[in-house]
Swiss-Prot record:
It comes from Canis lupus familiaris (Dog). The modification Phosphoserine is found at S159, S165, S715, S747, S1032, S1091, S1110. There is a cross-link at K148 (Glycyl lysine isopeptide (Lys-Gly) (interchain with G-Cter in SUMO2)). The chain crosses the membrane at residues 8-28. The gene is RRBP1. This is Ribosome-binding protein 1. One of its GO terms (cellular component) is endoplasmic reticulum membrane.
Length: 1534
């Protein structure tokens, strides 16, 4: 399903809107159900509507995303138990709730819009959790959105307009590295700190939600200023549910760096409210401990400005679950450093679409992780400003258990940022010595490694620069085991914010080494995704300057083994930002020396793309404005293929931060590469992709300026063995942002190239880069090509193509001519060529047939799919219409129920009021009144007694009148009942008559059905016979055709087989004779044996020993004979196999002979054709010669008339004469010198032509002789081969004859031996064995029969059980219906009791009043029985009508059959009738099944109704008891 399809989008939006509206109505109805007054309920409803304004939008989004991301829902608590109110109007200064102390460290950015509030510097009272005033542009966006989230494409297009004016800001931004409170570069630096950082449900200018359209830094579902927290509304660094200025903790509301529940200035701890750097519950200056208020170095659980601990949440260094402006944790969503699922202005998450920081599917400003949306400092699960560790959330440099001045580790002692056993200046590595931020073994400036002891920013066992990890070495803000700059991950070594094993600038993820915001394995400047490498907001696999990906190492945020300036690598010593052996200015390429962000051989502006030479941050093939998208051309921030100024995508040309194929403002999609937000494979200035090599955002093996790769070494962000300024990748060297395998503007190296300056400080310039051609052919060495070709598997077509390419390369043209000296056999070559061509032809024909069949299938499938699609569309439309109708019906029901509920509430409230009034005017007031009125009542007693008597008389009269009326009604009803009983009896008689008629009709129906069935059976039999005959005829016809074809083949086989049959019949006759002889000998032997046995029996007593010996000898002989027979049989089989093999060989030889003969014939034809052509050429040349001779003769005779051609001479003789007579003739005509000279020249020419022609003739003769010799050689070779083959054939025939003779001989011997071996005992044993087997088979068959019989009996029992179950179910249904009737009767009785309760309650009621109650009960019973009888009548009438209709149908069918007659009725019509009957039977069976299910459902419903009615009976009894009690009380009171 395409998400961006207009239909699906419309359906999704409409469905979401309807769901939200239904939820809203449900909430309203539930909230209004409280037992409060009507006015209070209305007030509560208004409040709830106001509170749930944002929840509607949130729920719509949560249904799509939150279910997938269960981790982020762990701490979605409301801040201080309150729901955020509506947004205030723009340009309104909102005061903080508690007093906030202003930190000395933070500096708020210069505001672009003057009316917006700037970050608090002094203590300011705050309103309770209200969103800060958004910028005017935010207001415009709000007007467009109105709490609705629009799809990603439209957000990109709309955000182009918003960010078009801010392109200049974003172009230069990516070079800078954000520190403590100052918003990160690439974020909208102009936006103020206070107005930024809004929560998840916020809607504002630059921090918009997932599908929102707005300026940079949008929260996941938020629409607000720059840095919005998950549910936070505040400045730049807000926590999860925080609404404060920048840097707020999870539930904090305060300045820029607030902790979890902190509300204060910048860098507040978890529950701290104060200046930057506050501890967990601390309120104070920057760098507070767990409960401390102090300088900027807080310990394990402290959350403060620059140095916050494990769970601290502060301005720039927030940990796992912190959400603060520049430094937000796992679930933080803020301006500069937003967490895993955070989407804010500059740090938007996976599916966020905002200005410059969007994530995997995000299109936005800089600083996007895989699922992270945070400003420049995002770790694996941390999302914070420059200093985020695994679970660290602090200002600049907080370790797990760090306690110190500014971010010291557990055992840290020393000045700024010292390692465990290291002593040096600030920022030294493990064994490093150098300026600030040296690598693992460096000793130097702040930010030292594992065993370094430095003042600021030490982690658990780390003593180094601010925020160093366990194995991390870098500048500020290192994580749990990190050593590096600020904001490092678990084992990150880097400047600020390094990952787990990363060493780089601030803000690295778990294994991230990069500037400020790196992902899990990202290495780059601020705000890197899990595998993202880009400027500030790169996608999954993007690698770029401030935001580098998995193994990227960049300037302030270096990669896994990167060592750079403030965060240098393992053995680096040098000024700030030096590689292992590198010494260079900041941001130099491997061999580049120049401005920041130069490539290997590039000299130019910062941040150039692969083939681009443009402003900073260009894409792979991009040239254009900053931040272009994949194929987009527009404002800044473009995607994958964009070409532009800073932050260009792969091939895109346009504005900043465009989507994959989008053209718009910032907010790019999954694979978009932006300045601050680049996509997966994009390579841009600040945020380029995995295979891109460019400006400060280098790829996996790229080496470039501030964002270096795995083994790069650069000035501020250098790799392990790389020497480059900043941003060098593993083996590539280029200016900013180099890709994995890309050839960049700024000089790449092949993996085997080594440049002279590779491991020396300061690489040298190599000229302005001409963009290399990415589409240029790949040149492989010969060995690798051979190995790869050898290992590959080819098609026939592919192999043919390869052969053609190789032949073209080698310039080989295969000649069909062969010289006499050639070694190869030309006939064999011709054969091979012929076979190859035939194979090729066959394969091509097969391929063509297959392709045609596939085409037909594909066409059929296409048509079927089109039909399916059309049907599916129609179904979907119908479903949509039905759902819309259902939704409207549900809405109407909800509204009606709500109105009823409101009415009931009003009634209840009125009753309560009356009761309250009665209570107020209770017994006290009545006593007073009674005492006052006592005298009046005594005076009026006489009058009252008289009045009471008169009233009683009047009431008695009225009651008697009512009694008379009731008695009359009873009489009328009893008469009506009698009449109805008479009617019922009449109807019963009618029904009995009708039943008789029905039975008669059924009998006639059955007879007609049987007749029809018989006729149908006959017709079906005839049909089957005709079909079988038709099929047999067709089969016979096909067989006949096949037999005709086979006959022709068999005729040829018969002739050959007849000869073989004759020979075999002769052999058989001989064998038969031998068999007869053998049988005769056998019979003789048997007679001899019998006689011998008789003799043996006679002389048993004498010769037992001799007989035993003879028997033993006989058995031994028998065994020997058997072994001989077995051997002979073996030999016979072997000989047969040899004979067969010889036959096969003979056949093969014959086939080869035929092929050789055919090839010879073809060769002879070719030679003959060549001979003919040569003879023709010879004749033509001779004709030309004769013509030239005649012409020369004529010319010479014309010139020299003295020459006489009298006698017929040859041309040579004539020429000799001319030579002899020539001088004489010339002497005779001395005057004619000129013409003679001409003639001489002509003569010479003629001689030359003659010589040439003779030479040609000689050549032709030699060629003819050669060809004749060739032909003779061929004939000889063929004759020799024929002789050889003949000799072989004769030899094989001789061998065959010999083998046949031997076979015959062996067969004779075998038969003789068999005859000797056969005996009667063996035959008897065989028969007995067969009998035993037969008996076994019979026993098995009988057992099987018994098992089958048992199975049949079981099945019958099952059938009977099922029938009994059905009967039981029916009986239960009847019982329950009876019970229902009884319960209804009881109910009616109870009602009558309730109605007559007042009469029963009075003590003076006469016994005559109880009679009408019983009469009413009897009446109701009779009514119930009448209703049941009426229902039965209806059923009977319905059945009778059905029976009549079926009888009518049967009669109509009979009439049709009679009218058509048996002769006219065709087989087809009968077949259709049969089908109809079958269908009817199927329907009947299905109806029976439905009826069974309906019976079960009815049973259930009746049971439920019984239970309900019993409950009602109980309730009524209770009410009766109550009424009885109350009536008795009233009686006593009177």
């Amino acid at each position: 399903m395409d998400i961006y399809d207009t239909q699906t989008l419309g359906v999704m939006v409409f469905g979401g809107f309807m769901v939200v509206s239904a939820i809203g109505i449900f909430l309203v109805s539930t909230f209004s159900m409280k037992e409060t007054s009507y006015e209070e309920a209305l007030a509560n409803q208004r409040k709830e509507m106001a509170k749930t304004h944002h929840q509607k939008v949130e729920k719509k989004k949560k249904e799509k995303t939150v279910e997938k991301k269960g981790k982020t829902k762990k701490k979605e608590e409301k801040p201080n138990g309150k729901i955020p109110d509506h947004e205030p109007a723009p340009n309104v200064t909102i005061l903080l709730k508690d007093p906030v102390r202003a930190p000395a460290v933070p500096v708020a950015p210069t505001p672009v819009q003057p009316p917006v509030v700037i970050a608090p510097v002094a203590t300011v009272p705050a309103m309770p959790q209200e969103k800060l005033a958004p910028s005017p542009k935010d207001k415009k966006k709000k007007e467009k959105k109105v709490a609705k989230v629009e799809p990603a494409v439209s957000s990109v297009v709309n955000s182009v307009q918003v960010l078009a004016s801010k392109a200049a800001i974003l172009e230069t931004a990516p070079k800078e590295v954000p520190m403590v409170v100052v918003p990160p570069v690439g974020a909208k630096a102009g936006t103020p700190a206070t107005s930024t950082a809004q929560g998840k449900k916020a809607e504002g200018a630059q921090n918009q939600s997932r599908k929102a359209e707005g300026a940079p830094n949008q929260g996941k579902k938020a629409e607000g200023a720059l840095n919005q927290g998950k549910k936070a509304e505040g400045a730049q660094n807000q926590g999860k549910k925080v609404e404060v200025a920048p840097n707020q903790g999870k539930k904090a509301e305060g300045g820029q760096n607030q902790g979890k529940k902190v509300e204060g200035a910048q860098n507040q701890g978890k529950k701290a409210e104060g200046t930057p750097n506050q501890g967990k519950k601390a309120e104070g200056a920057p760098n507070q401990g767990k409960k401390t208020d102090g300088a900027p170095n807080q310990g394990k659980k402290s959350e403060g400005a620059p140095n916050q601990g494990k769970k601290a949440e502060g301005a720039q260094n927030q940990g796992k679950k912190v959400e603060v402006a520049p430094n937000q944790g796992k679930k933080a969503e803020g301006g500069q450093n937003q967490g895993k699922k955070v989407e804010g202005a500059q740090n938007q998450g996976k599916k966020a679409e905002g200005t410059p920081n969007q994530g995997k599917k995000a299109e936005g400003a800089p600083n996007q992780g895989k699922k992270t949306d945070g400003a420049p400092n995002q770790g694996k699960k941390s999302e914070g400003a420059p200093n985020q560790g695994k679970k660290v959330e602090g200002a600049q440099n907080q370790g797990k258990k760090v306690e110190g001045v500014q971010n010291q580790g557990k055992k840290a002692e020393g000045a700024q940022n010292q390692g465990k056993k290291a002593e040096g200046t600030s920022s030294q590595g493990r064994k490093e010595e150098g300026t600030p931020n040296l690598g693992k073994k460096a000793e130097g400036s702040p930010n030292q490694g594992k065993k370094v002891e430095v003042v600021q920013n030490q982690s658990k066992k780390v003593e180094g620069a601010p925020n160093q990890g366990k194995k991390a070495e870098g500048s500020q803000n290192q994580g749990k085991k990190t050593e590096g700059a600020s904001n490092q991950g678990k084992k990150v070594d880097g400047a600020q914010n390094q990952g787990k094993k990363a060493e780089g600038a601030p803000n690295q993820g778990k294994k991230v080494e990069g500037a400020q915001n790196q992902g899990k394995k990202a290495e780059g400047t601020p705000n890197q995704g899990k595998k993202a490498e880009g400027a500030q907001n790169q996608g999954k696999k993007a690698e770029g300057a401030p935001n580098q990906g998995k193994k990227a190492e960049g300037a302030p945020n270096q990669g896994k083994k990167a060592e750079g300036a403030p965060n240098q690598g393992k053995k680096a010593e040098g000024a700030p930002n030096q590689g292992k052996k590198a010494e260079a200015a900041p941001n130099q390429g491997k061999k580049a020396e120049g401005a920041p962000n130069q490539g290997k051989k590039a000299e130019g502006a910062p941040n150039q793309g692969k083939k681009a030479e443009a402003a900073p941050n260009q894409g792979k093939k991009a040239e254009g404005a900053p931040n272009q998208g994949k194929k987009a051309e527009g404002a800044p921030n473009q995607g994958k293929k964009a070409e532009g100024a800073p932050n260009q995508g792969k091939k895109a040309e346009g504005a900043q931060n465009q989507g994959k194929k989008a053209e718009g403002a910032p907010n790019q999609g999954k694979k978009a590469d932006l300045v601050a937000n680049q996509g997966t494979k994009a390579e841009g200035v600040a945020g380029q992709g995995k295979k891109a090599e460019g400006a400060p955002n280098q790829g996996k093996k790229g080496e470039g300026t501030p964002n270096q790769g795995k083994k790069s070494e650069g000035s501020p962000n250098q790799g392990k063995k790389v020497d480059a300024s900043a941003n060098q990748s593993k083996r590539a060297e280029s200016a900013p942002i180099q890709g994995k395998n890309a050839d960049m503007v700024q000089s790449q190296e092949a993996p085997k190239q080594e440049a002279p300056a590779k491991k020396k400080s300061g690489s040298k310039k190599k000229g302005e880069p001409g963009p290399p051609d990415s589409d240029s052919p790949l040149y492989l060495p010969y060995k690798t090509l051979v190995s790869t070709v050898g290992s590959m598997v080819f098609n026939e077509g592919e192999a043919q193509r390869l052969i053609e390419i190789l032949s073209e390369k080698a310039g080989v043209i295969q000649d069909t001519w062969h010289k006499a000296t050639q070694k190869g056999d030309p006939v064999a070559i011709l054969k091979r060529q012929l076979e190859e061509k035939e194979k090729l032809l066959a394969t091509e024909q097969e391929d063509a047939a297959v392709a045609k069949s596939k085409l037909r299938e594909v066409n059929k499938e296409l048509a079927a799919e089109k039909a399916k699609a059309a049907a599916g569309e129609a179904k979907v439309k119908k479903q949509l219409v039905a759902r819309e109708q259902e939704i409207t019906a549900v809405q109407a029901r909800i509204e009606a129920s709500y109105r009823e509920h409101v009415k009931e509430v009003q009634q209840l409230q009125g009753k309560i009021r009356t009761l309250q009034e009665q209570l107020e005017n209770g017994p006290n007031t009545q006593l007073a009144r009674l005492q006052q009125e006592n005298s009046i009542l005594r005076d009026a007693l006489n009058q009252a007694t008289s009045q009471v008597e008169s009233k009683q008389n009047t009431e008695l009269a009225k009651l008697r009148q009512e009694l008379s009326k009731v008695s009359k009604e009873l009489v009328e009803k009893s008469e009506a009942a009698r009449q109805e009983e008479q009617q019922r009896k009449a109807l019963e008689t009618k029904t009995a008559a009708l039943e008789k008629q029905v039975l008669q009709l059924q009998a006639s129906h059955k007879e007609s059905e049987e007749a029809l069935q018989k006729r149908l059976d006959e017709v079906s039999r005839e049909l089957c016979r005709s079909q079988t005959s038709h099929a047999s005829l067709r089969a016979d016809a096909e067989k006949a055709q096949e037999q005709q074809q086979q006959m022709a083949e068999l005729h040829s086989k018969l002739q050959s087989s007849e000869a073989e049959v004759k020979s075999k019949s002769e052999e058989l006759s001989g064998l038969h004779g031998q068999l007869k002889e053998a049988r005769a000998e056998n019979s003789q032997l048997m007679e001899r044996i019998r006689s011998i046995e008789a003799l043996l029996e006679a002389g048993q007593a004498r010769d037992t020993q001799d007989a035993q010996a003879s028997r033993a000898e006989h058995q031994a002989r028998l065994k020997e004979l058997e072994s001989q027979v077995w051997c002979l049989e073996k030999e016979a089989t072997e000989l047969k196999e040899a004979v067969e093999q010889q036959k096969v060989k003979n056949n093969d030889l014959r086939e080869k002979n035929w092929k050789a003969m055919e090839a010879l014939a073809s060769a002879e034809r070719a030679c003959e054709e060549k001979l003919r052509s040569l003879t023709q050429a010879k004749e033509e040349s001779e004709k030309q010669l004769s013509l030239t001779e005649a012409q020369t003769k004529e010319a010479l005779l014309a010139l020299l008339p003295a020459l006489s051609s009298s006698a017929p001479q040859s041309y040579t003789e004539w020429l000799q004469e001319l030579r002899e007579k020539g001088p004489e003739l010339l002497k005779q005509r001395p005057a004619d010198t000129d013409p003679s000279s001409d003639l001489a020249s002509k003569l010479r020419e003629a001689e030359e032509t003659q010589n040439n022609l003779q030479a040609e003739c000689d050549q032709y003769r030699t060629i003819l002789a050669e060809t004749e010799g060739m032909l003779k050689d061929l004939q000889k070779s063929v004759e020799e081969e024929e002789q050889v083959w003949k000799a072989k054939v004769s030899a094989t025939e001789e061998e065959l004859q010999k083998s046949r003779v031997t076979v015959k001989h062996l067969e004779d011997i075998v038969e003789k031996l068999k005859g000797e071996l056969e005996s009667s005992e063996q035959v008897r044993e065989h028969t007995s064995h067969l009998e035993a087997e037969l008996e076994k088979h019979m026993a098995a068959a009988s057992a099987e029969c018994q098992s089958y019989a048992k199975e049949v009996a079981g099945l019958r029992q099952l059938l009977l059980e099922s029938q009994s179950q059905l009967d039981a179910a029916k009986s239960e249904a009847q019982k329950q219906s009876n019970e229902l009737a009884l319960v209804r009767q009881q109910l009616s009785e109870m009602k009558s009791h309730v109605e007559d309760g007042d009469v029963a309650g009075s003590p003076a009621a006469p016994p005559a009043e109880q009679d009408p109650v019983e009469l009413k009960a009897q009446l109701e019973r009779t009514e119930a029985t009448l209703e049941d009888e009426q229902a039965l009548r209806r059923k009977l009438t319905a059945e009778f009508q059905e029976a009549q209709s079926s009888a009518c149908r049967l009669q109509a069918e009979l009439e049709k059959l009679r009218s058509t007659g048996p002769l006219e009725s065709s087989a087809a019509e009968e077949a259709t009738q049969l089908k109809e009957r079958l269908e009817k039977e199927k329907k009947l069976t299905s109806d029976l099944g439905h009826a069974a299910t309906k019976l079960q459902e009815l049973l259930k419903t009746t049971q439920e109704q019984l239970a309900k009615e019993r409950d009602t009976v109980k309730k009524l009894q209770e009410q009766l008891d109550k009424t009885d009690d109350s009536s008795s009380k009233e009686g006593t009171s009177v």
